[in-house]
């Protein structure tokens, strides 16, 4: 199959040289216009119909396979981020986190396989890795967004699945001064789940656009401020072991009620100067600051996985325990507080210089930086330290939605029996017990990228080729990840929170920490729990001890990447058999240098020490590409693309860090199997190479008057060098033996168990992904003038993938983020100022990334979901209120929960999160 793909790619590349064509004078506007700062056709937005028409024009004129949305779509949908609107495009899906669409999958490939550009430039992210979290960008700032699904030699930093290009407004594209202000109020359909949370929010924005000096100088300014509340009824199951009868039974549960408040403030400015046809300069800046506060309160119930827990009154259905009474349960009350601060800034300066009538020089420089700090505070309370207090007896019953109702028998609001403590004695610092009455994580991430690009574009006459282009791009990226964590214990004595040093095992609940009303968990059957102010406890009651466990000390790392990209491209513009033909052939040469500095744990004299370590590597890739578009019949296009693309691994996989582990429990078990060796290590791999993909794309597109079209496209990707995150290699740890006590050393030598496993990601995977997409954008006036104003935009896709890892070559797995079936549809009416629309999107089950233990990324199967949004509005057409529009919107009207499960068994629900409906009422005034 791989040889077939390369053969097709080579044939397509050679096609341009063997065609007999007639040259035409027109020049093709290609995807690299984003980098030159010269947009294609100006978009004039007067409503959803104009927006869809301009998106259709963009799709029609491009030789690439591309889908677009315009400012009207982003500005009028009930969006929290741009991802809401992008999720309506064919083959694009969004994963909800904390009730917001944050992460995109394109053609079944998750956020790690796509890239995001701002005005054609690669961007950093506030996330842990490369995938952009789209709520870092205020959506009001963008004129249009293009999703390129096929590659072009001039499209720098393209992804395997696709490339999202966020396009800011260009003031010289507008003919008049524009001043617009908008204010929108928000209400969540659920009541406040925490008394110190918020239910109501707002969103405000202002835009100013003007032209000066005979329309040679343009200025655009934008400001945005928002406070977005959300509620979340959360349920988390620990897992489902088997009981003595072989039935699956819930191991434990962690239900919460959560209240979030996202505050975001942003500003954007664009200065554009074009004094002549031979010089065009654009400088733009975007800055965004957001803070998110989360208040979480709940109770952890150790059930069958608890210590000495009794199980009785069991009901079983098809090998699954649907109800049971658990005795000797010691619940852990949680009063948690999370705060995230993130700042993003992006600067870009583009200059296009006409050297003569046939030659242009483009020079582009940019810098982007993102900084994020997290404050993740947990506090615990219960009836006594190490199960010394009053035990609980709870009844757990599985509900029809997959949740377990949990009905306790003790009063969790009674401060006479509840204290600040470590109820189950879980605290352990790697060598001795600690009184863990809380825990604090304080990670910090800084992502910085600088880039410089220069390219020449020259016209060609009398040939199939209309122009040539050569250029180069240099980028330097550096991402720093720093982690700090602390045990929290009752104050009053001891050192380092250890039990042996005399740390108090509990502390009474201070009255100052009590909030006015207690939180209810009645959606699960818990009437109420003790509701405390965790910040008061942190500031006044609890001591902090640095978490110096080996696994915690080897997390800090820096990853640097220097990437040099050179490219050459020929643009095709002619005829084939009397049919209009456009296209391009080209190649990229990419040289990469990557380096990482971090820490590695070492074992010497029975003590684990942490040592600095660094590493580096370099490599070169060649990426050819070709695409053609033939207009076989008027307004009927066939587009074919073939390309080799790549995308770099996750940044945390490129880190050099390694954590050494020594498991005393495996000493003397009599096995030489490396899986049961006392020695192991886990970390990153600085020698990782990018994922590679050989792509074939085909699209059939028919366009109609008035902006309508239908299209069907298919794609095939042959994936190689796929990163296996679970790769293990056998390693001889015998060099460590002299540091061990003699008795342990002798047993290990006798068993031959000194060969252990080193877990490190490697490029040992391969696979394929293929699919088909269908789209219809139909204004109903095509069928009858009486239907003027009505229309639909609908799309659907089917995607299939098979990935084989070197660590498990016999079993194929699905890709993270891939839903086999995806569909979306919007029905709208817009006429004479009145507009209404209903949008629905569906995705089948997929492997989603969620936050696991200590906020570590974890993959679980997410259930299929369908989201319904709607809006209605009116814009005054004349009179004193002309320019004023009113909009009422609703989001997630189906109140669709986010649900994950494990082991391909929907009964084994792990996460259940219900966010409720959101309602918005807004005013916009333009003058």
Regions found by a protein language model. Name each.
Residues 44-77, 103, 111-114, 121:
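N-terminal periplasmic "start-of-domain" segments of outer-membrane beta-barrel proteins
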Residues 333-344, 555-561, 646-719, 752-771, ...:
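Outer-membrane beta-barrel signature, preferentially recognizing the C-terminal barrel domain
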Residues 83-122, 149:
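Extracytoplasmic beta-strand/coil segments of soluble accessory domains associated
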Residues 716-718, 723-730, 735-850:
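Gram-negative outer-membrane beta-barrel transporters
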Residues 196-308, 314, 324, 339-361, ...:
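Transmembrane beta-barrel wall of Gram-negative outer-membrane proteins
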Residues 155, 171-177, 213-217, 278, ...:
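Short loop/turn motifs that connect adjacent beta-strands in outer-membrane beta-barrel proteins
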Residues 439-441, 445, 453-459, 466-469, ...:
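Conserved C-terminal beta-signal and adjacent last beta-strands/turns
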Residues 121-149, 199:
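Short acidic/polar hinge/loop motifs at secondary-structure boundaries
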């Amino acid at each position: 199959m791989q040889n077939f793909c390369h053969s097709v790619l080579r044939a397509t590349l050679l096609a341009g040289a063997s065609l007999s064509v007639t040259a035409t004078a027109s020049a093709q506007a290609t995807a690299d216009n984003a980098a030159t700062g010269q947009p294609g056709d100006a978009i004039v937005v007067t409503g959803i119909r104009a927006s869809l028409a301009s998106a259709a024009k963009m799709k029609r004129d491009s030789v690439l396979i591309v889908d677009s949305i315009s400012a009207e779509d982003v500005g009028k949908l009930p969006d929290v981020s741009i991802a809401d609107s992008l999720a309506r495009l064919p083959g694009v899906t969004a994963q909800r986190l904390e009730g917001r669409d944050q992460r995109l999958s394109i053609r079944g490939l998750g956020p790690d396989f796509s890239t995001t550009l701002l005005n054609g430039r690669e961007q950093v992210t506030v996330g842990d890795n490369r995938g952009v979290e789209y709520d870092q960008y205020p959506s009001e700032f963008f004129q249009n967004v293009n999703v390129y699904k096929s590659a072009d030699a001039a499209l720098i930093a393209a992804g395997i699945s696709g490339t999202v290009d966020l396009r800011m407004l260009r003031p010289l594209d507008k003919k008049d001064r524009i001043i617009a202000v908008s204010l929108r109020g928000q209400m969540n359909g659920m009541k406040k789940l925490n008394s110190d949370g918020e239910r109501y929010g707002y969103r405000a924005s202002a835009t100013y656009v003007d032209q000066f000096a005979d329309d040679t100088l343009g200025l655009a300014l934008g400001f945005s401020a928002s406070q977005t509340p959300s509620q979340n009824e959360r349920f988390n199951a620990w897992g489902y072991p088997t009981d003595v009868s072989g039935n699956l039974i819930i191991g434990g549960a962690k239900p919460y009620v959560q209240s979030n408040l996202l505050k975001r403030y942003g500003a954007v400015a664009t200065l554009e100067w074009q004094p002549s046809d031979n010089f065009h300069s654009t400088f733009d800046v975007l800055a965004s600051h957001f803070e998110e506060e989360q208040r979480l309160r709940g109770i952890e119930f150790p059930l069958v996985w608890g210590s000495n827990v009794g199980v009785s009154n069991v009901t079983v259905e098809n090998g699954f325990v649907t109800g049971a009474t658990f005795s000797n349960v010691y619940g852990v009350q949680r009063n948690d507080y999370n705060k995230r601060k993130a700042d993003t800034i992006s600067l870009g300066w583009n200059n296009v210089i006409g050297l003569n009538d046939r030659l242009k020089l483009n020079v582009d420089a940019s810098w982007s930086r993102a900084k994020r700090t997290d404050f993740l505070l947990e506090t615990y309370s219960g009836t006594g330290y190490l199960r010394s207090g009053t035990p609980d007896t709870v009844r757990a019953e599985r509900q029809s939605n997959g949740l377990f109702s949990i009905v306790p028998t003790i009063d969790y609001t009674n401060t006479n029996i509840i204290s600040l403590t470590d109820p189950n004695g879980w605290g352990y610092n790697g060598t001795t017990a600690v009184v863990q009455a809380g825990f604090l994580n304080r990670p910090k991430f800084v992502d910085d990228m600088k880039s410089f690009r220069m390219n020449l574009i020259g016209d060609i006459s009398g040939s199939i080729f209309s122009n040539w282009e050569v250029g180069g791009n240099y980028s330097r990226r550096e991402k720093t990840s720093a982690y700090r964590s602390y045990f929290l214990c009752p104050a009053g004595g001891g050192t380092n929170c250890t039990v042996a040093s005399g740390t108090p095992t509990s502390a009474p609940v201070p009255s100052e920490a009590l909030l006015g009303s207690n939180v209810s968990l009645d959606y699960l059957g818990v009437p109420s729990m003790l509701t405390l102010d965790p910040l008061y406890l942190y500031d006044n009651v609890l001591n902090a001890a640095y978490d110096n466990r080996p696994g915690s000390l080897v997390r800090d790392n820096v990853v640097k990447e220097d990437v040099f990209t050179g490219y050459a491209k020929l643009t095709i513009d002619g005829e084939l058999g009397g049919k209009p033909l456009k296209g391009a052939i080209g190649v990229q040469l990419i040289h990469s240098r990557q380096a990482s500095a971090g820490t590695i744990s070492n074992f010497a004299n029975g003590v684990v020490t942490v040592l600095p370590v660094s590493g580096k590597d370099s490599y070169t890739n060649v990426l050819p590409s070709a695409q053609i578009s033939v207009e076989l019949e008027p307004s009927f296009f066939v587009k074919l693309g073939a390309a080799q693309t790549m995308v770099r691994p996750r940044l945390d996989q490129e880190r050099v860090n390694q954590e050494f582990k020594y498991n005393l429990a495996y000493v003397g078990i009599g096995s030489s199997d490396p899986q049961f060796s006392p020695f192991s290590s886990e970390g990153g791999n600085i020698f990782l190479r990018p994922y590679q993909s050989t792509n074939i794309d085909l699209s059939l597109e028919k366009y109609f008057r008035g902006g309508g079209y239908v299209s069907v496209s298919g794609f095939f990707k042959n994936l190689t060098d796929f990163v296996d995150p679970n790769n293990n290699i056998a390693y001889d740890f015998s060099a460590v033996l002299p540091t061990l006590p003699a008795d342990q050393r002798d047993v290990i030598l006798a068993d031959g168990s000194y060969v252990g496993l080193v877990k490190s990601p490697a490029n040992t995977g391969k696979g394929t992904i293929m699919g088909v997409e269908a789209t219809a954008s139909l204004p109903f006036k095509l069928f009858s003038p009486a239907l003027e104003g009505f229309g639909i935009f609908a799309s659907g896709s089917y995607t299939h993938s098979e990935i084989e890892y070197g660590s498990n070559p016999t079993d194929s797995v699905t890709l993270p983020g891939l839903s086999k079936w995806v569909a979306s549809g919007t029905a709208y009416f817009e006429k004479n100022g009145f507009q209404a629309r209903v949008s629905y999107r569906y995705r089948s089950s997929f492997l989603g990334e969620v936050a696991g233990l200590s906020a570590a990324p974890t993959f679980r199967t997410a259930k299929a979901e369908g989201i319904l949004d709607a809006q209605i509005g009116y814009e005054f057409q004349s009179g004193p209120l002309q320019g004023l529009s009113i909009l009422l919107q609703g989001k997630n009207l189906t109140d669709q929960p986010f649900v994950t499960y494990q082991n391909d068994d929907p009964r084994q629900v792990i996460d259940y999160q219900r966010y409720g409906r959101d309602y918005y009422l807004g005013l916009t005034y333009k003058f």
